Each structure stands twice: as C-alpha cells, then as structure tokens.
C-alpha cells in the first residue's frame, strides 16, 4: 500500500484498511487486535520524518512487532541518507477562464489550411465544424482563396474581420505557425488548437520549436492547445473542431486526454450508450496546456459533472497529483493511465514523449487524492457515465433484484469480490413486504430472485419496496429486456402480426420500458443509485429494455459485474468526500 507524504490521519487509516492481510490485524489466540490508531501514528511519524528530511532516501523498520496488548513497537530501523531531492516541476499558470471560453465556446472559428480535398485535415475539420451544427461564424484560409463547403476562404488572415474570431483551428505546417499566431493575435483571437506535428515528439529540434511557439503564444496572450492534437468538442455550442469523428450526444462528462484516440474511444462509447459529453479535448504534446489544466477548468464548468482523463506518463508527479486532488475535491475525476507496465511505459514514451512513473505509487497517490482510477477504457467510461447520471450512495448496502437466478448469483459474487460494497442481508420487514408480491418460491434473500412470478406491476412495486427501505443504499437490477427479446422473435416469425402477436409484442416492449422508467424515477425520488444491467445492452441495443434505459439518459450496463465495478467506484468516492467533510 503506497501513499505520498505528507500523510493525514485519514490517509494513514486508509492505508491500514487497504492491507490485504486484514485478518492478521485482528484478535488471535487470546492476544489483542492490533491498535490501529497506534499503527497509524507509526505511519504518521514516518511521514513527518520524510517531510522534514528530504535527504532521507529510505527507512527500513524491521521488525515492527505487535505486543500481546496490541501495541506496535519498532524494534529496529535502518535509515539511508542520500542527496536531497531538489527536483521541482514546472508551474505555468493555468489559462484564464476567458481563454478557456474562447476554446470551448468561441463566437467564431477560423480553420487555417482549409482544403477542397476531402482527405486533408483542413477539409475534415471544417466539415465537422459545419456538420455538427455550430452556429458561430466560420472562416477559413486557403492559398488560392477557394470556396470550401460553402465557406469563402481568404489567402491571408489580414483579410478577415477583427473581433469576430475567438478560436483558430490550425491545419497548416509547423513552419507557418509563428507568423500565423501573430496575425491571429492582431484579429483578437484568444485560443489556438494545433493539429500540427513535428514538435516535442520529433526530437531536439522539434522541442526547441515547441518551446519557441509556447513563448510566442504567451507573449500574444493566446491559449495554445496541442500541438500534435486531434481537436476539441463542446456540445453546449455544438462545436466539433476535430480532424476525426465522432460528435457525441450532449451530456455532463468532460474529457481530457493525452491521446487523441482515447478521446475518440470515449466519444464512441458516448454515442453507443447515449450518456453524453459536455467537453472533450486531446492535449497532444500539452506544450502549454496540460490535461490537469483542462480538468481544473472542468471542475468549475457548470456544464460538466464529472471529468474523465487519459494520461500516458508523469513528469511532475507531485504537481499533477496536487492538481488531481484539487479537482476531485470539487467533482468526481476518473483516470485511466497508460504505461502501467514496463512494456506500456516504453510505448507511452514513444507516443507523446511522456515519461512513465512507478505505477504502484501512482495508484496510491490517486487513492489519496480521491481520484477514481480505472484499468481499461471501458471501465473508465462506465465509471464516468455512472457519476454523471446516478446519485452517490450513502452507504455500501446493496441489493440485487433479478428475474433470473444465475445472474443474481454471479452478481452477488462480484459484490463480495469487489470488497467495497456490502451484499446486505435482507431485512425481515422488507422480506415480509416482498412476500406480498412474489410467489412462495421466491429466494427470500439477497439477491431478490423473482423466480418467474412476475405479473404486470411486480417489478416496479418490488423495486419501490427496496428503494424505500432506509437500510438499502443501492440497487442492481438484472433482467430487463427478456420480454422484448421474446417480442423480437415473435415479430421475426411467420405468424406475426396475427394470432394475437401484435398485441403481446406491444405489451412485452411496454413492460420493459416501464421497468427502465421505474428504475430511473425511483432512483431520483429516493436518492439511491439504481443500476440496470443486461447483456442485451451490447447484444441487441435496439431491444426495448436497454433502449428505454438510454432514453432516461442513464447507462445500461452489459453485465452485473460491470455495474458492480461502477457502483464500487461511486461508493469509494462518496467515502472519500464524507471522511474529509467535503
């Protein structure tokens, strides 16, 4: 278990709680349990030593024994003294709110290098801006002054109106960019997004050119996004200034990524699931504006409820985690990190020139900062989508409501394995209530297995009984879409629409719609997360069940296991906020 210093008392207790060897800390053969408060004081003492003495390279306390009364005692310690760590990260000021507004909500956009060739960045980006429904003014430069997609371009920026453009989207070569920035500044441009490559990722000469361009942008008062970036998305103003698709539905997830491909991945998941995006940006080389800068602004952005980030490496680890902690104290922050393995670290370095740090230390620092760390892009998006659409749980007590026994068993296993949630015992009064709605063969336990005894209103009524119970903190609902799956086969068969099938198909589909609506409405009414899961979310997304879940704006999870992982992230973050009085 790792945490960076300085530790707080809460950090120390969480480190102890995170040990895999919890049973060793309990009572054993008449000896007292370990005094966790005293053990936390040992950790706090080591933290104070490390903070006060930067020349301490390592401390090996061996052994740390526990007396019969439970008190820990350090018998011996080896302290290694080395050179003080004098490394310090860069501390560029974050761009202003006005500059970020120019990037994400510009009154006008200029595409430099607009092209009539549909394979060129200058065509694709202009097309995407126009096709996404952006209503601001759109301009383009083209050496021949050609008309591109109905936009009359100009050969020189000097020919454009002053004060009409906030954002320049740069599709011209690196060599042309210094003069271009000067001309844009003269027209009142406040933000520039550079797709141009050939900078810091391309060797020493490129790094010098990048540093010179950053200095020039600072001098001109222009926010410099990129270079070597993919683009920027802002759904509140229907802006899709990108060199690739897609444009996502509107929502409350803000995305910042060092990799443009990960931006595309998150936007694709948004389109698939219907859980929308507020802002998205690929930081590229992050020469002047880092992912942490974007995340810090997202934490202030009224359109954004949760931030989602991909990072490939850590240069200023302490500085980055301090920024992460500041963000997570205000809004949920989900991070997926490349370079977690030795092979991945090498790949990350070759991609954006990023340097990888020790992954275990990074993981511990994320936990300390309240950052939700995901292992995969799927887990990351689903965590962010859950934060964006579900209330935080007030406790770990979880009930599984299922229409099929096997799904409930597997999901119960997932809750136990996750370790953060509690598969609660079904309270006697709740069991008695449910008895009035289900046949005698139902499970009478958690998971609540309806045992095929549902009639028209059973699922919504049982779900409300569970949601209303004061000891229940969260619900995972399994089995939506089963009736609509049968309806699909009826429609595809040769007997439809006769034989009463048209009526029963409509009934089946309406039932699944009612179940999705009930899960959403009850979650809002009682302030408890209610996660709906079925493999039909991916196996048959047009099924009325998952389709109805999407219509509520919430995520329909592809399995109970994935719902449990997302719910565990919610409870972990809720605990982080509660313990720190946030």
Per-region residue spans from a language model:
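Catalytic-core regions of core metabolic enzymes
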Residues: 1-582
